[in-house]
Amino acid sequence: MALGILGRKVGMTQIFSPEGLAIPVTVVQAGPCTVTQIKTQATDGYNAIQLGYLPTAEKHLTRAQRGHLTKAGVTELLRHLREFRVDQPEAYQLGQKITVEMFSPGQLVDVAGTSIGRGFAGYQKRHHFGRGPMSHGSKNHRRPGSIGAGTTPGRVFPGMRMAGRLGGGRVTTRKLQLVQVDPERDLLVIKGCVPGVEGGLLEITPAKQVGNKR
């Protein structure tokens, strides 16, 4: 369990290695985040640190949210609050700033965000079903095929892959490598792609699993 950081996806680009290889990367504007609450085993039953991110206008926060930040002694209004489990919450203080300096180039991280919503999608797009014949009198072009038997069991089993809403859910991409860390501009350059749209909120944490899982 380790503390992470909040950020927003800027977009994708590419950089070149010393050998001249093009590396696709995602640029993330991460932090600075503010410690807004410290939870301990004695007070809350578990150890965690709550971070606030992205200064915003007062109209975007409820009275309860503003009171929570005031109680923590945080002067600026922060739009996003997220909690991270930690082993030693006593190592942090209310109002402390968390920046990208906690990471180093070459480190593996897990990135969580909300995937791009695709709306209502069919079987092929949502579940990668194969299509039916396109000619010779076939009318089964993009149909799903059988979804179960008849009288027995007389119902569609739960979990049957069918058409429905695609995307728009929480997704975590694991073990992505940090290519560059820029503390002056609060930027993380991550190899590969991360979930979500440009400007979407991301949670970046040190990788929980390093190596092959057995």
From Swiss-Prot:
Coiled coil: none
GO cellular component, as recorded: cytosolic large ribosomal subunit
Pfam families the record matches: Ribosomal_L3
Source domain of life: Bacteria
Alphabetized UniProt keyword annotations: Ribonucleoprotein, Ribosomal protein, RNA-binding, rRNA-binding
Chain residue ranges for the region called Disordered: 129-157
One GO process term, biological-process aspect: translation
One Gene Ontology term of the molecular function aspect: rRNA binding
InterPro entries: Ribosomal_uL3 (IPR000597), Ribosomal_uL3_bac/org-type (IPR019927), Ribosomal_uL3_CS (IPR019926), Transl_B-barrel_sf (IPR009000)
PROSITE patterns: RIBOSOMAL_L3
Subunit structure: Part of the 50S ribosomal subunit. Forms a cluster with proteins L14 and L19.
Cited function: One of the primary rRNA binding proteins, it binds directly near the 3'-end of the 23S rRNA, where it nucleates assembly of the 50S subunit.
Family: Belongs to the universal ribosomal protein uL3 family.
Protein name: Large ribosomal subunit protein uL3
Species this protein is from: Synechococcus sp. (strain JA-2-3B'a(2-13))
